[in-house]
Amino acid sequence: MLFGLVGSEMCIRDSRYLGDYVKRQTGADLLLWGGSCIVHEEFKAEVLLNLKHQHPEAKVLVHPESPASVIELADIVGSTSQLILAAQELDSSFFIVATEEGILHKMRQSTPGKTFVAAPTAGEGATCVSCAHCPWMKMNDLQRLIAVLKAKDTQVHIDEAIRVRAAVPIQRMVAYGQQRG
């Protein structure tokens, strides 16, 4: 059962890697879109394996939007909040982290005395050889959020029939989140 939908198909549009991970974990019948995250797609197993050999004591924390070959090398796979929690709870002092680089600051803040190294990116689309930088995530900040909330012209108008149909999956996501605590 996935999201309370027994025997239902579900489409995952954001990341084929995340969808593949969910499919392998749950056995759910998922329709996977060909999309991916530009950061997570750039992590490569062979490059991560080289870094693991340099730091055999390291625990590897991987976001599930990464390719399956990278996930296979992980000690922990999880959302950013799950990776932060794992870093706090695991009895290791050295971590290799395969997700957007911004998470490293939060990890260092919440677990002083532990070392965090960004997993290297290696693909053609990488913004640099060893950084997992998402330019779009950096566009969102508190000042811009406040500006949008204060602005009078930022309303989005949706046709009522579309709103009614769109409310169903949103209500399911909220209900699922409430069930999970």
Predicted feature locations:
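Glycine- and Gly-Pro-enriched alpha-helical subdomains that act as flexible
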Residues: 42, 49-60
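Donor nucleotide-activated moiety binding/catalytic core segment of transferases
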Residues: 75-91
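Glycine-rich phosphate-binding "P-loop"
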Residues: 35-36, 62-80
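Short active-site oxyanion
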Residues: 8-9, 56-59, 90-95
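Active-site glycine- and acidic-residue-rich loops that bind
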Residues: 13, 38-44, 96-98
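Single conserved hydrophobic/aromatic residue that forms the stacking wall/gate
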Residues: 1-7, 11-12
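C-terminal functional extensions of proteins
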Residues: 39, 64, 82, 91-92, ...
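Short, well-ordered alpha-helical microsegments
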Residues: 19-20, 48, 70, 84, ...
